[in-house]
UniProtKB/Swiss-Prot annotation:
CDD domains: CCP
Disulfide bonds: 72-106, 92-118, 123-164, 150-177, 265-307, 293-320
InterPro entries: DUF4174, HYR_dom, SRPX-like, Sushi/SCR/CCP_sf, Sushi_SCR_CCP_dom
HYR domain residues: 178-262
Outcome after substituting residue 73 to S: Dominant negative; secreted and retains ability to homooligomerize
Source superkingdom: Eukaryota
Name this protein carries in UniProt: Sushi repeat-containing protein SRPX2
Domain Sushi: 70-120, 121-179, 263-322
GO function terms (MF aspect): hepatocyte growth factor binding; identical protein binding; signaling receptor binding
Record bears the keyword Manganese: no
Gene name linked to the record: Srpx2
SMART domains with a match to the protein in the record: CCP
GO process annotations (BP): angiogenesis; cell motility; cell-cell adhesion; positive regulation of cell migration involved in sprouting angiogenesis; positive regulation of synapse assembly; regulation of phosphorylation; regulation of synapse assembly; vocalization behavior
């Protein structure tokens, strides 16, 4: 027994001597080596119950949560934050989210029962919107506000601002930029044009309108309402309207006025015993009016007048005077020249004044003087046998020489009744061997001998002789 007691005492003494030589591998109250700087959970160890001491103030290392805080409750009271058995509730500052354990406890192993850290909260990056952009106050972080704006020409529809919320989502919805602005269009200036001479219209040109889209610059269509540039415009005011459409079907219109002015002269009055024929409208710049006289009358003065740009007529008006026939000429040609382009001639030839056909014909013609005058017909009578032969135009007597030449020129015999109708150009147009009614003569003249001007005049005077 004595030997055994000595052996136990020696072993205890050896343990006491060796204990100071062991280097500790932890700091008091931390449970971590000097290089450790974050929370980490280790498997719980079963410590030597003789080593546990709840009185040690720093059994575990002091918790320090960056961007957060630890609220600890110790069995020894509120002033102890890392003693054995202390329980700490972990939380993060606003804008940060706790990753890890919400609650940890200081274990007998001198370690905390878990780890946690605070991660800054972020929302996903917002996509850019078509034809627009956004700016944010603090990037994609919590409470950052992103304000949307659209490119020129577009309007924002939807939420103008979105805020990054605590759940990591953005408030509101994604807006869109809509093109609701119409294009910009500018028409050419209104213009006034003078009608061309002898015309009631004017050709007007202009440049196309200036068109620009306020959004993406794309103009899909430009329509014109009215005549094209270079068209002939009649007298008056004409509205020309253009309409432009952009890609979003917005439209804008503009208009301008084309005014065509016709310079006009005072309306001419027809001469007494005559009439006028005018070109164009009869009173516009460049119009030509010709004076004509009724049958049995001839024009004295200028044959025509022109409407000038000064709005005045050229020359002075002529007059229609009774036609004066000079029978004291040297030849039948000289006599006929007086009727050239003025009068038609109806030459009546008979063997003697008592001829039945002659008397019948002259009687009918004397009753139709108005119709003959309207058709510009002068009657020449050649009656009898030499030396008592008589030739006359109205009341004027023809010489024997003129009578003979007329018979030869027109091949008129003295042997029987015969009659010839001569037009204004001196051409033999119809012969009659027996009396005819004035209506037959008038029908032939109206159908074959009247000019267009005379036809128009006849239409105006259709009922004059009734």
């Amino acid at each position: 027994m004595k030997t055994g007691s000595l052996t136990q005492r020696g072993a205890l003494l050896l343990l006491l001597l060796l204990a100071p030589a062991v280097t500790p591998t932890w700091y008091a109250g931390s449970g971590y080596s000097p290089d450790e700087s974050y929370n980490e959970v280790y498997a719980e160890e079963v410590p030597d119950t003789r080593a546990l001491d709840y009185r040690v103030p720093r059994w575990c290392y002091t918790l320090n949560i960056q961007d957060g805080e630890a609220t600890c409750y110790s069995p020894r009271g509120g002033n102890y934050h890392s003693s054995l058995g202390t329980r700490c509730e972990l939380s993060c500052d606003r804008g940060f989210r706790l990753i890890g354990r919400k609650s940890v406890q200081c274990l007998p192993s001198r370690r905390w029962s878990g780890t946690a850290y605070c991660r800054q909260m972020r929302c996903h990056t917002l996509p850019f919107i078509t034809s627009g952009t956004y700016t944010c106050t603090n990037g994609m972080l919590l409470d950052s506000r992103c304000d949307y704006s659209c490119s020129s020409g577009y309007h924002l529809e939807g939420d103008r601002s979105r805020i990054c919320m605590e759940d990591g989502r953005w408030s509101g919805g994604e807006p869109v930029c809509v093109d609701i602005d119409p294009p910009k269009i500018r028409c050419p200036h209104s213009r006034e044009k003078i009608a061309e001479p002898e015309k009631l219209t004017a050709r007007v040109y202009w440049d196309p309108p200036l068109v620009k889209d306020s959004a993406d610059g794309t103009i899909t269509r430009v329509t014109l309402r009215g005549p094209e540039p270079g068209s002939h415009f009649p007298e008056g005011e004409h509205v020309i309207r253009y309409t432009a459409y952009d890609r979003a079907y917005n439209r804008a219109s503009c208009k301008f006025i084309v005014k065509v002015q016709v310079r006009r002269c005072p309306i001419l009055k027809p001469p007494q015993h005559g009439y006028l024929t005018c070109s164009s409208a009869g009173d516009n710049y460049g119009a030509i009016c010709e004076y004509h006289c009724d049958g049995g009358y001839e024009r004295q003065g200028t044959p025509s007048r022109v409407c000038q740009s000064s709005r005045q007529w050229s020359g002075s008006p002529p007059v229609c005077t009774p036609m004066k026939i000079n029978v004291n000429v040297n030849s039948a040609a000289g006599l006929l020249d007086q009727f050239y382009e003025k009068q038609r001639l109806l030459i009546v030839s008979a063997p003697d004044p008592s001829n039945r056909y002659y008397k019948m014909q002259i009687s009918m013609l004397q009753q139709s003087t108005c119709g003959l005058d309207l058709r510009h017909v002068t009657i020449i009578e050649l009656v009898g046998q030499p030396p008592q032969e008589v030739g006359r135009i109205r009341e004027q007597q023809l010489s024997a020489g003129i009578i003979e030449e007329l018979r030869q020129f027109q091949r008129l015999t003295r042997s029987y009744f015969n009659m010839v109708l001569i037009d204004k150009q001196g051409i033999d147009r119809e012969r009659y061997m027996e009396p005819v009614t004035p209506e037959e003569i008038f029908t032939f003249i109206d159908d074959y001998l009247l000019s267009n001007q005379e036809l128009a005049r006849r239409a105006e005077q259709r009922d004059v002789c009734e």
